[in-house]
A protein has these predicted regions:
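An N-terminal assembly and electron-transfer interface module characteristic of large anaerobic redox
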Residues: 1-278
Length: 278
């Protein structure tokens, strides 16, 4: 706790300090946590940045977590968005910390990693399609639980996905449908990869009568002051409801339950019934 420089930083960032402390107690000889200014370009936005916390929090960790003083902490700047250049630059970075790692080895590992990432995203999209098809066959509402990839962590989302399912609805993530939308104009500069997915998901469900979106927002997230307004505008332009849930280290879901009950009550006329939470 004492290594966290600001209590206003988002909860996922706070958790990193605990991860680093645990790794230091495991006596590891190196920690790889690079800075990533850019994310992969999915063709949905004007640019493809990571948010400042995702991109540069390794700098904060290096300056504040003194248990890393005797551990090789690799927090160099890398660019996974430039696949052609990545192996050469990654080889140069690793050479500063380890001996005997060749360009060929790094290229082979990078090719395998990019292939696995593509396969992972394909599995997410296929599974999302399966859930949508099953929910429609059963006449159930579909909730797009939208946020960042790390919001899928149960420690961070506190089981909100399961709570939504207890109302009888199906749950999918924004990255399972964002690829179904082509880049479109927004009211703001659409320059963050994760945000672009969010806007695309909101655009997609705008004409889907059995779909609604719930946005997860971390307390202390400055850029979500922008995403919430833009997502609300996209949805309300087409007569859709916008529901926001702020999450942090507090695990009590009482307030969340109220928001969800309100959402399902509001969409009752469209669906014909309101599922009851158990």
């Amino acid at each position: 706790q004492s290594t966290i420089p600001s209590d206003t930083v988002c909860y996922p960032a706070k958790l990193l300090h605990g991860h680093i402390h645990r790794l230091s107690r495991m006596a590891v000889n190196a920690v790889f946590y690079p800075c990533l200014t850019y994310n992969v370009d999915e063709g949905l936005g004007d640019n493809h940045y990571n948010c400042p916390v995702v991109a540069y929090y390794p700098e904060v960790i290096a300056a504040n977590c003194h248990e890393l003083e005797n551990i090789r902490f690799i927090y160099d700047y890398i660019g996974i968005h430039r696949r052609r250049d990545f192996p050469r630059k990654m080889t140069a970075i690793l050479a500063k910390y380890f001996a005997g790692i060749s360009l060929g080895e790094v290229k082979g590992a990078a090719d395998a990693a990019y292939a696995e990432y593509a396969e992972h995203m394909s599995r997410v999209r296929v599974r999302g399609g399966e859930i949508i098809a099953q929910a429609r066959a059963e006449g159930r509402q579909i909730i797009v639980l939208a946020g960042r990839p790390y919001h899928a962590d149960e420690e961070i989302n506190h089981g909100i996905d399961k709570l939504i399912c207890s109302y009888g609805a199906a749950v999918i993530t924004e990255d399972s449908i964002s690829h179904l939308v082509e880049k479109f104009p927004t009211s703001i500069l659409n320059q963050w990869t994760y945000h672009s997915r969010l806007y695309a998901a909101a655009k997609y469900i705008a004409d889907q009568p059995d779909m609604n979106l719930v946005q997860l927002v971390s307390f202390g997230c400055g850029v979500d002051a922008i995403t919430t307004d833009e997502t609300r505008e996209i949805l309300q332009r087409e007569g859709k409801l916008y529901t926001q849930i702020k999450i942090d280290e507090i695990a009590n879901l009482g307030a969340v339950n109220i928001r969800l009950r309100s959402l399902f009550a509001a969409i009752e006329p469209a669906s014909g019934e309101t599922p009851d939470a158990e």
